[in-house]
C-alpha cells in the first residue's frame, strides 16, 4: 500500500513518516528496523498484485519462498519452465515461487501487467503468482528488493562468464555492488522470512533444487 509523502512521491505505507528518508529504499528499511525495535524479514513487506491489489507477504509465513525478478523477452526467459516445475513439484511440501517482472535490464519486460500475465499463462502455463512490475535497482526500487539486496549482496564475478562480461561492459558501475545484475536473479527465503541465499541469473532452477529439498525436509 502506498501513501503520498510531502513531495508527492509515493511511499510504502508500512514505513512510519519518520522512516521516509528521501528516496533511498535501503536506508528507509534500515530506519524502519530501528523504529519497530525488531529485526525485519521478508514477511514485513507488502507488494502490489498485477490487478492492483496489495498482498502482505506475511501470508506466506511458514513456507519456503523463491523470489525471482522475471522478464518476457530475455534469453533467460525459458527459466520460467524450470521455475514452474519446481513450484508444481514442491508446493505441497511448502515451496512458494513469487515472480516480480522488471523492465530495468535491456527493456526486456516492456508489456503491461495484463500482458505479462497473459504471456506467463499462455507461454509457460505459470501457476505461481507473478506480481505487478517493479524496479529492483535505483532510487525507485521496491522496498522488498532493497531489503533482499542488502541481506544477500551476491557473489557475482568473472566465474559467471558471458553474463559477467556483458554486465561489466554495459553497466560497469554495478560490479562489486549489491545491485541486481540481470533478469532471473533468485532469492531463497526460509519459513521465518529470513534471506538464506542469492542465486545469480544463470543459476538455473534445477540447480537450486537440492537446496530447496534440504530446506523443505529440515
What are these regions, as identified by a protein language model?
Residues 93-111, 127-138:
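Thiol-based oxidoreductase modules, predominantly thioredoxin-like and allied folds used
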Residues 119-202:
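Thiol/selenol-based redox catalytic cores and closely related redox-interacting motifs
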Residues 63-64, 72-73, 77-100, 120-124:
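Conserved helix-turn-beta segment immediately C-terminal to the redox Cys motif
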Residues 7, 49, 190:
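Short, acidic, Ser/Thr-enriched surface-loop or helix-capping motifs
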Residues 35-58, 78, 155:
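N-terminal "domain-start" segment that seeds a small globular fold
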Amino acid at each position: 500500500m502506498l501513501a503520498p509523502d510531502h513531495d508527492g512521491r509515493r511511499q510504502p505505507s508500512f514505513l512510519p513518516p519518520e522512516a521516509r528518508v528521501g528516496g533511498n529504499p535501503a536506508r528507509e528499511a534500515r530506519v524502519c528496523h530501528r523504529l519497530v525495535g525488531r529485526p525485519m524479514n521478508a514477511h514485513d513487506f507488502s507488494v502490489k498484485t498485477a490487478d492492483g491489489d496489495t498482498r502482505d507477504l506475511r501470508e506466506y509465513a511458514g513456507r519456503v519462498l523463491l523470489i525471482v525478478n522475471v522478464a518476457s523477452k530475455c534469453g533467460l526467459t525459458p527459466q520460467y519452465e524450470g521455475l514452474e516445475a519446481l513450484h508444481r513439484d514442491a508446493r505441497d511440501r511448502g515451496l512458494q515461487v513469487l515472480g516480480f517482472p522488471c523492465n530495468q535490464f535491456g527493456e526486456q519486460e516492456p508489456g503491461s501487467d495484463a500482458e505479462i500475465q497473459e504471456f506467463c499463462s499462455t507461454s509457460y502455463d505459470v501457476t505461481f503468482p507473478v506480481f505487478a512490475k517493479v524496479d529492483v535497482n535505483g532510487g525507485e526500487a521496491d522496498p522488498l528488493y532493497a531489503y533482499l539486496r542488502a541481506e544477500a549482496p551476491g557473489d557475482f564475478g568473472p566465474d559467471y562468464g558471458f553474463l559477467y562480461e556483458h554486465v561489466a561492459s554495459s553497466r560497469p558501475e554495478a560490479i562489486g555492488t549489491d545491485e541486481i545484475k540481470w533478469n532471473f536473479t533468485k532469492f531463497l527465503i526460509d519459513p521465518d522470512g529470513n534471506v538464506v541465499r542469492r542465486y545469480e541469473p544463470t543459476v538455473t532452477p534445477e540447480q537450486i533444487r537440492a537446496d530447496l529439498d534440504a530446506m523443505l525436509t529440515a
